[in-house]
Amino acid sequence: MHHPIIKPNHMQIPWHDPIRDQKELPVSQAPLPIRAGVVGRVGLLLLSCGTGAWRVRSSMNEIAEALGLVCAADIGLLSIEYTCSDGENTFAQTLTLTATGVNTAKLDQLERFVKRFPLDGVYMTADDLHLSLIHI
């Protein structure tokens, strides 16, 4: 039986593109889309490890709070729709995975990242944060 190849229905997310003009700022002082992007990326990475929605949401909220944001998220098996607000403006985004699995080693590293974030992550640049996340 012949099965057609299913092509991914998503586009790559250029996490570093919005950062170009903000390279030297700590992420806590970066514009809303950059701060919200960190929140969403951490959530998507956690979701990709196969962890539950409540755990993803809790971690996203920890990152958001450390960045001075309030975040509301709808989390499915393969996607996250979220909105972050800084009290004046909002930023909404939908992020989707093409597949999911279980990766407890990566999950452990991400949970450590989330726990350390309020202590030292808020002082890192967004570019450095995204580079850290690439290595997890």
What feature does the model see in each segment?
Residues 1-122:
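Soluble N-terminal domains of membrane-associated systems
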Residues 72, 131-132:
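Acidic, proline/serine/threonine- and glycine-rich low-complexity intrinsically disordered segments
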Residues 134-136:
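Conserved small/polar residues in nucleotide/adenosyl-binding loops
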